[in-house]
Amino acid sequence: MPRNIHYVKSKTTAVFEGIPGVGKSTITTEAARELKRRLGDEYIIFLNFAPLEGDAVETVLATNTKGSKRGMDFIRMVYDPEIKAENLHFATTVTGQLIAKELKFNSEYVVDKSKGKKHLINIIERNSASAAGIFIAGNYYNMRLASDLPGDVRNRYDGDWKNVVHTQNNMAAAAKNVFLTADESERFIIVFLETDYKKAFERVVKRGRNWEADKMTIDYMRELDNLQRQYDGLVDEDKALHWKRLYPVEQVKTIHFDVDKYYTGKEETKERDIINMVEDCNEVLFRHLIVPERKSLWKRFMDFVLPK
């Protein structure tokens, strides 16, 4: 089947990282909408690999919503003590699913400055790199070390991290290869949303997503936070992989954004607090999005006078 190729002037992917309850879905959705409003027709804005237009937001986030059977089933598989010990292998395939989506995206949206008419910005929650770097180790902890069936787990081949790490290595290699299919001019911005894991756990319980609120434990949240910090490079690697081992580092910028000051716990200001968080994060992101054709006249003059 022939590929449906769309040529663009440039591509930028902003990847939002953070543990459950940090606000990834809220911030990414509103960031995409705000960029579309501010940047206008010169830009194509994507949210999780889908064009942001009409009801695309609701479709993209369907797996995260309370009414989504697919999302509910996956969350149940990961968290429910009665069945999670059976599903470690399946849980690791999330990385493979993301790899397939990213390869398709890279093959269909190609940078060609002479043929492309618009710039493309893709706003996403996680990607195959973070899935390989964090998810496999996180699922191993949750489905093996924190299993309610410790005797059964010891008898499994994948009850030993020395065996599971081969899956992580293979997925990490595949995730790295995805970046080889991207254009060398493509830029990646990693936005690390930071929070105290205890506060994040409280927010997860309150938001009431199916199975997540009832089955997630504070111990698992603490481990996810530990793995996320390893991925971010804030602490030494143990089972997680540092993002620099997966990305083309020279094409990456990073942002660290603390969300806790916006979660005041005051019901009367909750809506305003969330709006402030989204707006502030959007401003930080916008400043890091180098817009090639929107340089000020002064900047263009200085580039001419003092060429690099």
From Swiss-Prot:
Matches recorded under InterPro entries: P-loop_NTPase
Keywords of the record: Coiled coil
Residues forming coiled coils: 212-242
The protein's name in its UniProt record: Uncharacterized protein ORF44
Organism: Ostreid herpesvirus 1 (isolate France)
